[in-house]
Curated annotation (Swiss-Prot):
Lineage per the UniProt record: Bacteria, Pseudomonadati, Pseudomonadota, Alphaproteobacteria, Hyphomicrobiales
Pfam families: Aminotran_1_2
Catalysed reaction, written as an equation: L-histidinol phosphate + 2-oxoglutarate = 3-(imidazol-4-yl)-2-oxopropyl phosphate + L-glutamate
Family as reported in the entry's similarity comment: Belongs to the class-II pyridoxal-phosphate-dependent aminotransferase family. Histidinol-phosphate aminotransferase subfamily.
Enzyme category, top tier: transferase
Cofactor(s) of this protein: pyridoxal 5'-phosphate
CDD domains attached to this UniProt entry: AAT_like
This protein's pathway: Amino-acid biosynthesis; L-histidine biosynthesis; L-histidine from 5-phospho-alpha-D-ribose 1-diphosphate: step 7/9
Entry-annotated residues carrying N6-(pyridoxal phosphate)lysine: 223
Name under which the protein is recorded: Histidinol-phosphate aminotransferase
Claim: Zinc is one of the keywords in the record: no
Length: 370
């Protein structure tokens, strides 16, 4: 067959840079502390593990394609109508489905400068054009986002809190953003880290979804619930948006194990409280300790911190990453986000956090002595 006749992806597909997950390997013989993917150090709820195991005797059966039990559990937790909830294989799938449903060739999707990489991937996969709004102090800027909106804009994506910076917008600013958008533009509030936020002026956005026809909120079970391996996400949206997404959603996009584990996890309030309390204790400790070493740390409300390094030989983020990796401490390079001189560190176990602080202290001292 002639090479000229081989199948060719449609325009734009090969412009997509595939998402690269955080590293998960250390050198042989070195204890691994994986702090690259914002996973909870407490692991999943024991109730979730038990519920998942109970599904193992009936693997020949298809799962409930509507994830009814999980939607009802989520609705009960947050006081929502289960008919306004869609579950997906992680919030990533839901972000993609929303994009495919509402954005196509010639359309634009707007997101902030250091927003989640999946937005760009989804927009390009749908044949649309990504539009990036500049941030201010590593924080989304409502005025810049509104300025980026054009008649071709179909979706505005806002990660709140944002990954990888850990910054957030107060709810008044989110409302101002929504008020400035045309009614035909969908505002997608990506609240993957909402459970960790301890700020009185923050809200994930449920109120705005309830009172609007063009607002969606997505959430995940991959972070505070510790179920990243099972890929469980959910969104709450206006009925018309739910209908559109369900028309293109795969009929069995969540496994029976995922549905069972998620249903049990969301009911385990004690486990969630313990995970949040661990973060409450360690986030300020890690931030203060790294700052005391002379490193700049972006103030974070999530379960991670963004650490900035000098753009200098021997002191760069790449140098620090190599130094840490050799000691089994795996952080996240964020050059793909336009932050080549930074590393993102998950708030891990006490042992892992202390190991990173000690290792970065050694790294900084070695450079001072060089």
């Amino acid at each position: 067959m002639s090479a000229a006749l081989r199948p060719v992806p449609r325009p734009g597909v090969l412009e997509i840079e595939a998402y690269v997950p955080g590293k998960s390997a250390a050198p042989a013989g070195v204890k691994l502390h994986k702090l690259s993917s914002n996973e909870t150090p407490l692991g999943p709820s024991l109730a979730a593990i038990a519920a998942m195991r109970e599904t193992g005797a009936h693997l020949e059966l298809y799962p409930d394609g509507s994830a009814t039990d999980l939607r009802r559990a989520i609705a009960g937790k947050y006081g929502l109508d289960p008919e306004r909830i869609v579950c997906g294989a992680g919030s990533d799938e839901l972000l993609s489905l929303l994009t495919y449903a509402y954005l196509g060739p010639g359309d634009e999707g707007v997101y902030s400068q250091y927003g989640f990489l999946v937005y760009r991937i989804a927009i390009l996969a749908a044949g649309g054009t990504p539009v990036v709004a500049p941030e201010r102090d590593h924080t989304a800027d409502v005025d810049a986002i509104l300025k980026a909106v054009t008649p071709r804009t179909r979706i505005v994506y806002l990660a709140n809190p944002n990954n990888p910076t850990g910054t957030y917008l107060p709810f008044d600013e989110v409302r101002r953003l929504h008020a400035g958008l045309p009614g035909n533009v969908l505002l997608v509030l990506d609240a993957a880290y909402a459970e960790y936020v301890r700020r009185n002026d923050y809200a994930a956005g449920l109120e705005l979804v309830a009172e609007s026809e063009n607002v969606v909120m997505t959430r995940t079970f991959s972070k505070v619930y510790g179920l990243a391996a099972l890929r469980i996400g959910w969104m709450v949206a206006p009925a018309a948006v739910v209908d559109a997404v369900n028309r293109i959603r795969g009929p069995f996009n969540l496994s029976t194990a995922a549905i069972a584990a998620g249903t049990a996890a969301i009911a385990d309030d004690a486990h969630i409280a313990a995970a949040v309390a661990h973060n409450d204790a360690w986030l300020p400790k890690v931030t203060r300790a790294l700052t005391d070493l002379g490193l700049q740390v972006t103030p974070s409300v999530g379960n991670f911190v963004l650490i900035h390094f000098p753009d200098a030989p021997g002191r760069s983020a790449a140098d620090a990453d190599a130094f840490l990796t050799a000691r089994g401490l795996i952080l996240r390079r964020v050059g793909a986000y336009g932050l080549p001189n930074a590393l993102r560190m998950t708030i891990g176990s006490a042992e892992a956090n202390e190991a990173v602080i000690a290792a970065l202290g050694d790294f900084m001292r070695e450079q001072d002595d060089a």
